[in-house]
A protein has these predicted regions:
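Conserved alpha-helical scaffold segments that buttress catalytic/binding sites
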Residues: 2-174
């Protein structure tokens, strides 16, 4: 928009525009510090009847009304770093868990080559393996261990089985 006043008003309307995490720009990862990535995947559970694939969209909707500055710490992450929402990992074969894990690994491999650090929003637990595989041998880590912050109510880790409902790379184990 050419009118700066109108553009400023529209940016404050959380229901307007492309829904992104915390209303950050929807841009490519190149020359950015952090890329927010949606990973809308549920088939690591052997079914899409569970709704983990709806997580990225739901979080984008909820985060759009939140404040972009932490009042207690007086921290505005968008001033401290260049943060963008690069959208979702595409899953043309969304019901094929093995293919989805390959798509995740490819997507995060390309993201790693851009030099941008990812923050991913899933999806079921099976997304973790593909992400760690891509980043563990990537440019950013240069062979160093990958740091993983996994926020969940439970781990769903099973070490005594080689599959979960037929999925070899599943939400249950890697």
């Amino acid at each position: 928009m050419a009118d700066k006043h109108l553009n400023s008003m529209m940016e404050n309307l959380y229901w307007w525009g492309i829904p992104t995490l915390f209303r950050c720009p929807n841009e490519e990862a190149k020359n950015q510090d952090i890329a927010l990535v949606g990973v809308p995947h549920s088939t690591g559970n052997g079914t899409t009847e569970r709704d983990q694939h709806l997580g990225p969209r739901a979080l984008r909707n909820v985060s759009s009304v939140g404040r972009r500055m932490h009042n207690e710490f007086q921290l505005n992450p968008w001033e401290a770093a260049k943060i963008v929402d690069v959208g979702d990992v595409p899953f043309p074969r969304a019901n094929d868990n093995e293919d989805c894990i390959e798509q995740i690994t490819r997507f995060f491999g390309k993201l790693d080559k851009s030099g941008t650090r990812p923050v991913s929003i899933g999806g079921d637990h099976s997304i973790t393996g593909g992400i760690v595989q891509a980043l563990g041998c990537g440019e950013i880590t240069k062979g160093e261990p990958v740091c993983l912050l996994h926020l969940d109510a439970h781990t769903d880790v099973f070490t005594k089985v080689d599959h979960f409902l037929g999925a070899k790379k599943s939400a249950a184990h890697w």
